[in-house]
Design a protein with these regions (language model features):
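A short beta-strand-turn-helix
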Residues: 1-9
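Hydrophobic beta-strand anchors of alpha/beta hydrolase catalytic cores
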Residues: 9-10, 38, 83
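Conserved redox-active cysteine motifs that mediate thiol-disulfide chemistry
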Residues: 12-29
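Solvent-exposed loop/turn segments at secondary-structure junctions
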Residues: 14-18, 44-48, 70-71, 99-102
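Conserved segment of the thioredoxin-like fold in thiol-based oxidoreductases
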Residues: 22, 30-67, 80
Length: 116
């Protein structure tokens, strides 16, 4: 999860989760920043065509990855949406529960200080 000196915002989502669907436009806007990569994780573990169908129907434009919980040494979320904020050096600095806005996500990044 340490790529290109960018902050990583890892968002766990599911198509049946209304707050997840509502925050996707905010995540798309955040992903446009030069210093941030938004990475989606489908909570239901969908792959292939099933995942592509959900991604297209929700208008997700950011990359989707496999669940990184084990690699990060954190438990898999039990509540959706859950968003992890990771510094460019790979340090997990925040686990956010519930829907986020671009402002709330940018505030966490700002408060976490300059990249380590």
């Amino acid at each position: 999860m340490t790529q290109s000196g960018r902050w990583k915002v890892v968002n766990f989502w599911a198509i049946w989760c209304k707050p997840c669907r509502e925050e996707i436009p905010e995540l798309r806007r955040l992903d446009e920043r030069e210093d941030v990569s938004v990475l989606g994780v489908n909570f239901d573990g969908k792959q292939g065509n099933d995942l592509a169908t959900d991604v297209a129907s929700l208008g997700i434009t950011f990359q989707n990855i496999e669940d990184p919980s084990q690699a990060l040494g954190v438990p898999r979320p039990t509540v959706l949406p859950t968003t992890l904020i990771i510094t460019p050096s790979g340090e997990l600095v925040a686990t956010l529960i519930g829907p986020q806005t671009i402002e709330s996500l940018e505030a966490v990044i700002r408060q976490s200080g300059p990249p380590r």
